Swiss-Prot record:
Transmembrane regions listed in the UniProt entry: none
Composition bias type Basic residues, residue spans: 106-116
The protein's name in its UniProt record: Aflatoxin biosynthesis regulatory protein
Function (record text): Transcription factor; part of the gene cluster that mediates the biosynthesis of aflatoxin, a polyketide-derived furanocoumarin which is part of the most toxic and carcinogenic compounds among the known mycotoxins. Binds to at least 17 genes in the aflatoxin biosynthetic cluster, leading to the activation of an enzymatic cascade reaction that results in aflatoxin biosynthesis. Promoter regions of several biosynthesis genes are bound by aflR in a dimeric form with a 5'-TCG(N5)CGA-3' binding motif. AflR also recognizes 5'-TTAGGCCTAA-3' and 5'-TCGCAGCCCGG-3' binding sequences.
UniProtKB keywords: DNA-binding, Metal-binding, Nucleus, Transcription, Transcription regulation, Zinc
SUPFAM superfamilies named among the record's database cross-references: Zn2/Cys6 DNA-binding domain
InterPro entries: AflR (IPR013700), OAF3 (IPR050675), Zn2-C6_fun-type_DNA-bd_sf (IPR036864), Zn2Cys6_DnaBD (IPR001138)
Amino acid sequence: MVDHISPRASPGPIRSSQTRRARKLRDSCTSCASSKVRCTKEKPACARCIERGLACQYMVSKRMGRNPRAPSPLDSTRRPSESLPSARSEQGLPAHNTYSTPHAHTQAHTHAHSHPQPHPQSHPQSNQPPHALPTPNGSSSVSAIFSHQSPPPPVETQGLGGDLAGQEQSTLSSLTVDSEFGGSLQSMEHGNHVDFLAESTGSLFDAFLEVGTPMIDPFLESAPLPPFQARYCCFSLALQTLTHLFPHAPLGCQLRLTDGEDSSCNLMTTDMVISGNKRATDAVRKILGCSCAQDGYLLSMVVLIVLKVLAWYAAAAGTQCTSTAAGGETNSGSCSNSPATVSSGCLTEERVLHLPSMMGEDCVDEEDQPRVAAQLVLSELHRVQSLVNLLAKRLQEGGDDAAGIPAHHPASPFSLLGFSGLEANLRHRLRAVSSDIIDYLHRE
């Protein structure tokens, strides 16, 4: 007896994974895409990621349309009855299949009886089950289509006990119709509705896992949003320093807490201004010594800190026009306890209490206090001078980096002209404060 060949072993139009196209990478790397900046498209690492020390990764771009479906691992274990010959085939009886063609039925009846029958469908055998009869609108149309596309059966398989099953299985394997689709139709026509539902659900679920699974960006997954809490870095240090330079900012603010806290104007003395500015300049020097100083936004905050330090020095020297009198009383009454009476200038101007006090280790009387304060501030301006020189160097480096970036690009807050304007503004402000103090001392 000739061994029956399994339909899974017969060669067919099996799609190979090697014929798939090579996956195409995205034009922009993950870091540039998340920052919404133009990527230089250099692989394996772009120039922007190399400059900033970031991990440059190019993700796989998702092609349009459906991906070619890979063979499911469930095909080998889904229907074992298809790969094994049936008991009726071993005993010489024809196996019934809803995909059988009229030509195959004719050969089966010719092998079972000695005389040929022209219309085997109209005279079924008595030992066949009723559900194997072809329906007028169901299996007959499908059989007609498959018989039109199927090749003639091999000659060496005719006359054997399992010839019908082998012919039908070879016919099904040579068709271009999906095997899962054919198995589902066969289950429906045989009444196996439970198997049909299980197979269709599994195939749809496999297709969803292959096509519909979204691609997760590893950069966003590895770098979640930080919680709203205090973090020690150059940005937090700059913000904290800038906040300390605005002690009167809560006055008149609509967002401040109103649970009975004191909103009176706490005036600062000359010693407090000098010590506070010294801490601010030390913090700025630490920031400029860090690699974070290459960021344009951080440099903008540092420029604001230096300008505020110069404003406090001018107020402590008495060369700035303020609303504070020599005795600490205001001429407009803008520093009352009521927030509604606080003027807009009281929130931002630097108000220093000029009273006879201890300046360093010496006690100064009321007459010599303005002159001593001006001399003390003038001796402290060298800190700001060295700080401005260091900041100008950083601004020049930031301007060189921003030279190839358009003015409207969000990678930097200022263009090349903007950075040069910041440096010119700082030097002009420093010269103005020092010249005002020198002129004041000459008049005294």
